[in-house]
């Protein structure tokens, strides 16, 4: 007996998207062309107003580059949720810093502020909340903790395109945010990150 594969997520790709990809392919400029800059501008305007964006090859790379830009590296610790995709912790580890896993709130599956507070050490430099399944992390409490301890906040918004908290876009609360466009995300470009 065979069982057909049931894809966990199948993006909706219509003729408009297919035509847009074909138009770019016909130009021969398939990397860093004008469509990339337009996408960066439109993404910011629509989803995270008042910020800037740089398109990269993946959400993991977006997290990694943000951490490097902030000077995170060996000897530093970044608090991450215990329930997340591997990229969250891996992006910290590849900088040479140490990911410190903090427990989640079992009702929201996002970082527990109490667990974050308990995880802070003298080496802690940042908190990396994950806005999961479109549900924002408790940013008010996390920002208060970050301010009290002089920590940065790096938002992993890979699964929260368009989500808001108190009328404010996720991705606009921290020092930086990263989004993913992997096919299983709620907005895809086949691959990519911002």
Predicted region positions:
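Short, conserved catalytic or interaction motifs in soluble domains
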Residues: 58, 104, 132, 183-184
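PLP-dependent aminotransferase-like
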Residues: 68-157, 164
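Solvent-exposed, non-membrane alpha-helical residues enriched in polar/charged side chains
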Residues: 22, 26, 40-44, 64, ...
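Conserved active-site segment immediately N-terminal to the catalytic lysine
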Residues: 155-189
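Glycine-rich phosphate-binding loop of ATP-grasp-fold ATP-dependent ligases
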Residues: 190-194
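N-terminal "arm"/small-domain region of PLP-dependent enzymes with the aminotransferase-like
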Residues: 1-29, 34
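Phosphate-binding glycine-rich loop
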Residues: 29-77, 91-95, 100-103, 168
């Amino acid at each position: 007996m065979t069982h057909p594969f049931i894809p966990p997520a199948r993006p909706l790709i219509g003729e408009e998207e297919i035509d847009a990809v074909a138009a770019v392919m016909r130009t021969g400029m398939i990397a860093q062309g004008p469509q990339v800059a337009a996408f960066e501008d439109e993404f910011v305007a629509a989803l995270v107003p008042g910020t800037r964006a740089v398109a990269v090859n993946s959400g993991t790379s977006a997290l990694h580059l943000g951490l490097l830009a902030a000077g995170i590296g060996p000897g530093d610790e970044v608090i991450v949720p215990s329930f997340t995709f591997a990229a969250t912790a891996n992006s910290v580890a590849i900088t040479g810093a140490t990911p410190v896993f903090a427990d989640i709130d079992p009702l929201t599956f996002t970082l527990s502020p109490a667990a974050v507070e308990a995880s802070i050490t003298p080496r802690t430099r940042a908190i990396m909340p994950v806005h999961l399944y479109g549900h924002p992390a408790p940013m008010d409490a996390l920002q208060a903790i970050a301010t009290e301890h002089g920590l940065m906040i790096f938002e992993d918004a890979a699964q929260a395109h368009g989500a808001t908290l108190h009328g404010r876009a996720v991705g606009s609360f921290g020092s930086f945010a990263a989004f993913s466009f992997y096919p299983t995300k709620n907005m895809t470009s086949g691959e990519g990150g911002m």
